[in-house]
Structure formats: structure tokens, C-alpha cells
Amino acid sequence: MKRVGASLVSLAVFVIAWKLVTVVGSMPEYILPAPEVVAERGVRAIGSGVLWEHAGVTLVEIVLGFAAGASLAVMTGIALGKSVLVERVLSPYIVAAQAVPILALAPLLDIWFGGGLLARVAICALIVFFPIAIATMVGIRSADPLLDEMLRSLGAGPAKRTRLLEIPSALPVIFGGLRVGVTLAVIGAVVAEWAGAGSGLGVLINIANQGLFDTPLMFVALAALAIIGLAFHGLVVLAERRLVIR
């Protein structure tokens, strides 16, 4: 309850500060709309179904992209953590892919995957992959060597040691990567939509900004993205609390 109360207080302070800026600075609506203007535009967007339509598309992209990227990242991270040879072979490619801006790669991936949902999921998965893979690798290598030696002496093979020791030991670090990855999934979905999509919150932002000159609608789309990001981050934190033994 204390956390919820603190969050509500910080939200209230943010909204009040936002309102003061618009009043004191005499900001025109097309530059910085007042909170009540954005709220009213949000109600209209929800009532007309526009927000639901675009948010639904983005949600699907985030869920599929995060699931694909996180699954592949965890498996790759385990392999990297257990084998120095695998790390030496794969690390240059992983780092190189991460070093290239996703905005530059997105149009190319859109072409390779033929556009559509598959392309956007691939872009989202790529941006999610790196932090989770690295976190998993670090976590796997943090397993207690004494416990590992004890399991070896009891006849446990590599797979059993991974299941009983390395993965449980790595979970706190893996979940740290998942927290970062799930927020990056939201960014990845928007970037993917900018690369080529007919709907989604990223598309709605472009329509509001460039087509309709509707700044309040753009703020509504941004707020929806923030809420989605917070919700998914909260789910990861909840899963962490249930699965990680402190």
C-alpha cells in the first residue's frame, strides 16, 4: 500500500507540474497540451475505438517479440555461460548486432521478413535479445563453485548441474535482464511499426503528429505506451518475487 500511495503522490505531483508549465509558460496546445485536454482526447479515442485498435496491435507485437527474444536469449545465455568457446564464437556477432542502431536495421529486417507481423516481432525480439542474453550468461557463471563440485562428486552431469544449480543461481540476474528487456520490447514494437505498419501505437503517433497535427492524441498514444510498459514490467517483477528465493 505504501508503494501504491507513493506512486499516486508522484503522479499527482507530475500532473500538477505539467499543468503549471502549460499555464505559466502559456504553452499553445500544439506544443504542450494541458493534462485535462489530453485526458479529454483520451476519452474520445477510447470511445471511438481508435486507441483500442492500435493498442491491441502493439500489445500482440510486444508479447510475441518479448517471448521470442527472451526465450532465445536465455538459451543463448546459458550456452555462453557454460562454454568459453561458444562465447568466443558468438560474442562478436551478438555485440555487432547490438552496436548497429535498431532504427537502421528495422527497414532491412522488414524487407527480409516480408513485412507484416512476423517482421515486427523479429525487430522486437532483436532489441530484447542482448540484455537478457548477457544477464543470463553472467548469472550462469555466478553459480557457487563449491556447490558445483559437490554435485559433480555426486555424479551429476552438466544438464543436471545446470537445472539444479546454475539456473536457480542465475534467476535473480536473469530477471534483471528481463526487466530491461520487457521495457525494450515496447520500444522495439514502436520502432518496428515506424519501419512499416498500417496500425499500432507507433503508427498512431505518426498519424497524430504528421497527418492530423493532433498533439493531444500523440500524448494519449505515448501515455498508453507508458502504461503498457509499466504493466509488463510489473508482471516481470511479480514473477520474480514468486520464483526467486531471496
Where are the regions a protein language model picked out?
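Glycine-rich helix-loop "coupling/hinge" segments at transmembrane-helix boundaries
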Residues: 111, 140, 187-225, 244
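Short helix-to-coil transition segments within interhelical loops
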Residues: 140-146, 150-170, 211
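Generic hydrophobic transmembrane alpha-helix motif, especially the helices
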Residues: 95-131, 138-139
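Transmembrane alpha-helices
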Residues: 122-126, 159-192
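Transmembrane-helix boundary motif in ABC transporter permease subunits
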Residues: 64-94, 111
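N-terminal signal-anchor transmembrane alpha helix
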Residues: 2-26
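Periplasmic/extracellular loop-to-transmembrane helix junction in inner-membrane transport proteins
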Residues: 23-67, 207
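C-terminal transmembrane helix and the adjacent membrane-cytosol boundary/short C-terminal tail
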Residues: 84, 141, 172, 219-246
